[in-house]
Amino acid sequence: MERIKELRDLMSQSRTREILTKTTVDHMAIIKKYTSGRQEKNPALRMKWMMAMKYPITADKRIIEMIPERNEQGQTLWSKTNDAGSDRVMVSPLAVTWWNRNGPTTSAVHYPKVYKTYFEKVERLKHGTFGPVHFRNQVKIRRRVDINPGHADLSAKEAQDVIMEVVFPNEVGARILTSESQLTITKEKKEELQDCKIAPLMVAYMLERELVRKTRFLPVAGGTSSVYIEVLHLTQGTCWEQMYTPGGEVRNDDVDQSLIIAARNIVRRATVSADPLASLLEMCHSTQIGGIRMVDILRQNPTEEQAVDICKAAMGLRISSSFSFGGFTFKRTSGSSVKKEEEVLTGNLQTLKIRVHEGYEEFTMVGRRATAILRKATRRLIQLIVSGRDEQSIAEAIIVAMVFSQEDCMIKAVRGDLNFVNRANQRLNPMHQLLRHFQKDAKVLFQNWGIEPIDNVMGMIGILPDMTPSTEMSLRGVRVSKMGVDEYSSTERVVVSIDRFLRVRDQRGNVLLSPEEVSETQGTEKLTITYSSSMMWEINGPESVLVNTYQWIIRNWETVKIQWSQDPTMLYNKMEFEPFQSLVPKAARGQYSGFVRTLFQQMRDVLGTFDTVQIIKLLPFAAAPPEQSRMQFSSLTVNVRGSGMRILVRGNSPVFNYNKATKRLTVLGKDAGALTEDPDEGTAGVESAVLRGFLILGKEDKRYGPALSINELSNLAKGEKANVLIGQGDVVLVMKRKRDSS
């Protein structure tokens, strides 16, 4: 109080006021503090002080020609004195108002294109629905989220090249536009921004927003896709949340979502094939998501999900060093361990060989609906702090942590035999056996774990074996917390290796991921996923297998035709016929195959024309291992549309219908393509029939001279073509086989 009184007295003297307002500041340290560097030290004060002046703005000299000296109210708009530090004019804020009202206008056509992301955001908010506000404790955990809806997924370098090419095409400097997306975007943007008058720098900034994914590590409870993150400040506070439904979707969220679905489908399918790794790569390379190659998306998209990471590992890309177990992402935050093989006995006296982690370690566990901190020693859980959305989610996290701890009481809690298998009918490894067992029923596990009295700690409560909360007792070492555990924030990626069974290991040999970790959740993709690989035909059901098999034969007819006559065994073993076998009744597969192969052999041996259409129709049936029998069939059954449908050996049926006039094939009413004529070989196809040692190429071709009789054919050299008279006066073009075949 004394000091304030003293100041009041000082201020009442006019000399004090004069010193404070009139004298110059000449202390070097102060001058340095406020004048060094370009960064404004006190922006708010500077703004107030500038705006109090009459002419706080400077403008280019040309402005005098374009703006009157006074406005309609007679207020001066610019000063006749030049700005001291430059050759610019001093201008009043009123000049800006005048310019905005009366200045020259320019075409607005480019604004929505350049500021596309803003215009789209306004639309999303306009059509979004805001629901009621709920007050409750928010369990937020920091996750790495995409904060920029509506972007492509280019790397910073790729985007930089595109921006330079679009905005500053005449600047020097090497720019390499290689990826498909780079080229498409560049072409599209150049067309959109022709004659654009918006400042190039602004255009460049806005393009960057459109091309590059920007992520931040933010506390989130609820939706993490970018259309939710853009309204984070409106939807969740410390103790409240507001319901919100976005008024539109953006492609980048759709890509992320569809990528996860495609990757899961591919990993699941690869697991059951003979060589999972080769199959997985074949499928990744032949799949498109929303019209873009999946491998291109994998290279650019930072989504971390088990199946996506397995695909990335297979492609030799780096992935996060965290590992996955029971659907939770584990990240070791301290400690270390060595792994030793140990044999343990379950409660059912079954012997399990497990890899025991010896040593003290701490982990964070992050799942979709629950998070936890786990401290463990060798085969012992020391402490588990869990938080989650609901009882169910918390229980899931506790089970995973208990199994991961490898404690003896967990192994002894097993009742019954462990014989869980994966999709390929292979036994799961022991840790996943235990996990599946307790995920089905954890009652015994929780009952046998043991409970302990607990201290009263802020923000923590206990949880009982029946998963009810308690302030007195809790499962041994387990506590439930109100606070979530943050996701691992680092974006560091490590080099990994993958074996043919799709197990992903880091360079120390620790397993980070395996197909067992891939979620079984089925979703509907937002973007069209096109699987070109025959391995994925069955994903859309039996009809799709049928149509795709015949489409494949027709598309590849030229090569199929030659193999059919020269190397049928190789043809029958093609993987494209694998999915078809699941449609043929098990009991009939071998008989059908034997029947069709015999029929085909007769066609190769016996004189006379034969119908391409029939070969195409019956070919898929010949792929199964044949049974030798004298059985004859007039129709073959396939299981589609929930029942057996017949394909007639001779003639059309609803399943397989060939229209001679249009040369088009329909399978189950869907168009399966046309039998095209081969320009080199007349009508290779429709009349293709076979003489022993000769391939019939099609109708007569006058270029090869008059028709020979069958006896004269023996004079032809291998590979030579000739017209020949067969059957009922038909003349066809044949070629002597290059090699003999039965």
UniProtKB/Swiss-Prot annotation:
Pfam families on file: Flu_PB2_1st, Flu_PB2_2nd, Flu_PB2_3rd, Flu_PB2_4th, Flu_PB2_5th, Flu_PB2_6th, Flu_PB2_7th
GO cellular component labels: host cell mitochondrion; host cell nucleus; virion component
Gene that encodes the chain: PB2
Protein's name in the database: Polymerase basic protein 2
Motif Nuclear localization signal in this chain: 736-739
Keywords: Cap snatching, Eukaryotic host gene expression shutoff by virus, Eukaryotic host transcription shutoff by virus, Host gene expression shutoff by virus, Host mitochondrion, Host nucleus, Host-virus interaction, Inhibition of host innate immune response by virus, Inhibition of host MAVS by virus, Inhibition of host RLR pathway by virus, Inhibition of host RNA polymerase II by virus, mRNA capping, mRNA processing, Viral immunoevasion, Viral transcription, Virion
Family, per entry: Belongs to the influenza viruses PB2 family.
Gene3D superfamilies (alphabetical): Polymerase Basic Protein 2, C-terminal domain (3.30.30.90)
Family matches, as SUPFAM superfamilies: PB2 C-terminal domain-like
